[in-house]
Amino acid sequence: MKKLLAAAAALATVSTMAMAERYVMITHTQGTDPFWPVVEKGGRDAAAAIGAEFEYNFDPSGDMSGMAKLIEAAAASNPDGIIVSLPDADALGGAIRAAADAGIPVVTMNSGLESSAAVGALMHVGQPERLAGEKAGARAKAEGVTNGLCLNQEAFNTALVDRCEGYFSGLGGDLNMIDVSNDVTQIETRTAAALSADPSIDGVLAVGPHVCAAANKAIKDVGADVHLSCFDLSPEVMDMIQAGDAAFTIDQQQRLQGYMPVIVLHLYNTNAGMLPGANIPSCLLYTSPSPRDLSTSRMPSSA
């Protein structure tokens, strides 16, 4: 009897393992941005909470064709769902649509809110990027900025372009955006060159945390008196805000962007296609210094 019970338990364990859900997340990081490990951890934590397997992939080259191939490879492995950032719908849309047409549920996250439904995704989890940029620009204007510069480390990424365009919509004035790349040395060099070429620039928006840190160094090297604001959180950005080197950052809640798609897909797969009634906007939050610590305040939900 004991042997029979042991065999039954072993069979149940094998069956449970075979039935475990498996989700694949693919993002456009090149592995240098401190933003994305937080997203990945959110996905892994969600998968652990529901007992699912989780895979995380990215193309270190940052090439969109390479990312599309990763999506195709994930679809070929027949997972229970794919989670993907969508910085370039033209380059990635075909692979995402093919996965959806093959019956694999897809949720987009982070970038690609406007294109998510068109490429066949069930829904999107992420920040409304243009609105976030507008709020950053409006706050910079209220804090005295008159002539801005937006630093974009991924020229192909429509979400970052939306942030920059929104910034100048809120600030007023024509778009002044430069491609600084993801290389820290290039970010510093190009930012310093732009500030030296136009000393009237009194406001800089960095649309990524590592860009913000590099921009801060460039500003100090040039000796410019510039209002610096950022997107996203990192320990270095938090220290910069506390020290007064950055005015504020906009926290788009990247852990939520990694966590919620896994939960959404789990509910979809285990509850007869249940989905939230709308896309899930990750919170628009300002993080700025208070006398004792870093305070966080929610932005208004509309422009």
Model regions and ranges:
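Hydrophobic alpha-helical segments within soluble ligand-binding/sensing domains
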Residues: 67, 123-148, 187-188, 233-237, ...
